[in-house]
Amino acid sequence: MKGEHLGEFEEFTLLAVRALGDRTYAVPVQRYVEEATGRPTSMGAIYAALARLEDKGFVQSSMGEATAQRGGKPKRLFRVTPVGLKTARELHRVRERIWTAIAEGRRS
């Protein structure tokens, strides 16, 4: 694994893959991120984030079956790894602690 820290966009992408389930591919991930964030998202940004997540060990990819509608080209399918799931859950816990502290007026 190259690194364990995630940027905001990588986090959104990781969560989208998790929400869409195993064996999702880039197009639904892009649509999910756009809908969830309300921001336009390019396919290039999605592909780059998925590549970084795979380099870090947070997602795994495999090639799906070739389909006629894709001109015989297979889709690259993604799934969240156990390490990716653990990281996503930890990020969620950190955000909850911070928001709880804010709500309670604590500074640290």
Pin down the residues of each PLM region.
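Basic amphipathic alpha-helical segments that dock to polyanions
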Residues: 46-53
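Amphipathic alpha-helical dimerization/coiled-coil segments
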Residues: 83-108
